[in-house]
């Protein structure tokens, strides 16, 4: 009779070889993790919205969806404020310049640049 350690080692090797098969690995269910999109923004897990089976609960479902979006975005209100429209001068004017007319006075003229 063989020493008891040989059958034990063979059994252990057999079990370890079976444990490494792809069929025994847990299947990945969908895209549940965090990822980056093509622009580099961090995207969270996929949000599964409740199914609307009846039209009586339509308002409650809409409120639930709004609450979900508020929780995800961290917004205290449903629509973010719209940015104000600015012209080119206002966009590139520096705060230390003050008046927008000062911006045109600080730009060097062509003849001054050519002289130097």
Curated annotation (Swiss-Prot):
Signal peptide (UniProt feature, chain positions): 1-24
MF (Gene Ontology): hormone activity
One record GO biological process: regulation of appetite
Gene Ontology CC terms, in alphabetical order: extracellular region
Cellular localisation: Secreted
Tissue-specific expression: Isoform 2 is found in ganglia of ganglioneuroma and ganglioneuroblastoma, as well as in differentiated tumor cells of neuroblastoma tissues. Not found in undifferentiated neuroblasts. Isoform 2 is found in the skin, in pericytes covering microvascular arterioles and venules on their abluminal surfaces. In larger vessels, isoform 2 is expressed in layers of smooth muscle cells. Isoform 2 is not detected in endothelial cells.
UniProt xrefs under Pfam families: Galanin (PF01296)
Keyword Ligase found: no
Principal location: secreted
Propeptide boundaries: 87-116
Protein's name according to its UniProt entry: Galanin-like peptide
Organism the protein comes from: Homo sapiens (Human)
Gene behind this protein: GALP
């Amino acid at each position: 009779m063989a020493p008891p350690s040989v059958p034990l080692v063979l059994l252990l090797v057999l079990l370890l070889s079976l444990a490494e098969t792809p069929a025994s690995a847990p299947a990945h269910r969908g895209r549940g993790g965090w990822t980056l999109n093509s622009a580099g923004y961090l995207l969270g897990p996929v949000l599964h919205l409740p199914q609307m089976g009846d039209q009586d609960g339509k308002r409650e479902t809409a409120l639930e969806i709004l609450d979900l979006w508020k929780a995800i975005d961290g917004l205290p209100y449903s629509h973010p404020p719209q940015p104000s429209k600015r012209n080119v001068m206002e966009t590139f004017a520096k705060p230390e310049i003050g008046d927008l007319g000062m911006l045109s006075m600080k730009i060097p003229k062509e003849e001054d640049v050519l002289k130097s």
